[in-house]
Design a protein with these regions (language model features):
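N-terminal metal-binding scaffold of metallo-dependent hydrolase/deaminase domains
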Residues: 1-43, 54-55
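Residue-level marker for buried hydrophobic side chains located in beta-strands
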Residues: 5, 47, 59-61
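N-terminal hydrophobic targeting/anchoring segments and the immediately downstream early-domain regions
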Residues: 34, 54-55, 68-70, 74-75
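Residue-level structural signal for beta-strand termini and adjacent loop
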Residues: 39-42, 61, 73
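A short, polar/charged loop-to-alpha-helix boundary motif
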Residues: 44-50
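Histidine-centered catalytic micro-motifs
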Residues: 58-70, 125
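Active-site gating loops and adjacent loop-to-helix segments of metal-dependent hydrolytic enzymes
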Residues: 71-102
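Active-site loop-helix segments enriched in His/Asp/Glu that coordinate
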Residues: 95-145
Length: 145
């Protein structure tokens, strides 16, 4: 994976017990793991990034997702429906989803999550096909999420 050094970060959110925000800190990562946080880190990195205009915060965690719904979430026909009517309408669509749609919708959803800082996601797959959860797990592995 290599190494990454982000120098002089404008604001680094620690999420520690005091909720400290560090100004002008550096972060050094190696093989996907944070190895050092501090000022003036002098490490040779494969990639060095100027963080002076950046906010750095820990990865977000999504504890409730339905990735198979990615391609049916904004259908105009169901906007404004009450929950039961919404579910009845969409179950008619979801009963026909196949392995390819689960794979593609999962990857699309994971891409959106990662783009917006989410590093962990718990997916609730409860519809067809029967082995859909295994397909989604494989996409999590492929995406590194």
């Amino acid at each position: 994976m290599g190494s990454l050094l982000i120098k002089n970060i404008h604001s680094l959110v620690t999420c520690n017990g005091e909720d400290r925000i560090l100004r002008g800190a550096d972060v050094y990562c190696e093989d996907g793991f944070i190895r050092a946080i501090g000022r003036g880190i002098d490490s040779k990195a494969d990639i060095t990034v100027d963080g002076s205009h950046m906010l750095c915060y820990p990865g977000l965690v999504n504890t409730h997702h339905h990735l198979y719904q990615q391609f049916s979430r904004n259908l105009p026909e169901v906007q404004g429906f009450e929950l039961f009517d919404w579910l009845r309408y969409l179950y008619d669509i979801w009963k026909n989803i196949d392995e390819e749609l689960i794979t593609l919708s999962s990857l699309t959803g994971m891409g959106e999550l990662m783009k917006n800082g989410c590093t962990t996601c718990f997916d609730h797959h409860y519809v067809f096909p029967r082995d859909g959860g295994d397909l989604i797990a494989a996409q999590f592995e492929a995406a590194g999420l």
